[in-house]
Amino acid sequence: FSGLEAAIVLIAFVVVAAVFSYVMLGAGFFAT
Protein backbone atom coordinates (compact mmCIF):
# COMPACT_ATOMS: atom_id res chain seq x y z
CA PHE A 1 0.00 0.00 0.00
CA SER A 2 1.97 2.94 -1.30
CA GLY A 3 1.48 6.66 -0.70
CA LEU A 4 0.14 7.11 -4.22
CA GLU A 5 -2.61 4.56 -3.62
CA ALA A 6 -3.47 6.25 -0.33
CA ALA A 7 -3.72 9.61 -2.12
CA ILE A 8 -5.96 8.13 -4.82
CA VAL A 9 -8.28 6.58 -2.24
CA LEU A 10 -8.39 9.81 -0.25
CA ILE A 11 -9.17 11.92 -3.33
CA ALA A 12 -11.84 9.46 -4.48
CA PHE A 13 -13.46 9.52 -1.02
CA VAL A 14 -13.48 13.34 -0.98
CA VAL A 15 -15.01 13.48 -4.47
CA VAL A 16 -17.75 10.98 -3.55
CA ALA A 17 -18.51 12.84 -0.31
CA ALA A 18 -18.70 16.17 -2.17
CA VAL A 19 -21.04 14.77 -4.83
CA PHE A 20 -23.22 13.07 -2.20
CA SER A 21 -23.54 16.25 -0.11
CA TYR A 22 -24.25 18.28 -3.27
CA VAL A 23 -27.03 15.89 -4.32
CA MET A 24 -28.55 15.87 -0.82
CA LEU A 25 -28.40 19.67 -0.70
CA GLY A 26 -30.06 19.92 -4.13
CA ALA A 27 -32.75 17.42 -3.14
CA GLY A 28 -33.42 19.42 0.04
CA PHE A 29 -33.82 22.62 -1.95
CA PHE A 30 -36.16 20.92 -4.44
CA ALA A 31 -38.22 19.35 -1.64
CA THR A 32 -38.91 22.63 0.11
Curated annotation (Swiss-Prot):
GO terms for cellular component: archaeal-type flagellum. This is 24 kDa flagellin. Keywords: Archaeal flagellum, Glycoprotein. There are 2 or 3 different flagellins in M.hungatei. Belongs to the archaeal flagellin family. It comes from the Archaea. Glycosylated. Flagellin is the subunit protein which polymerizes to form the filaments of archaeal flagella. GO terms for molecular function: structural molecule activity. It is found in: Archaeal flagellum. One of its GO terms (biological process) is archaeal or bacterial-type flagellum-dependent cell motility.
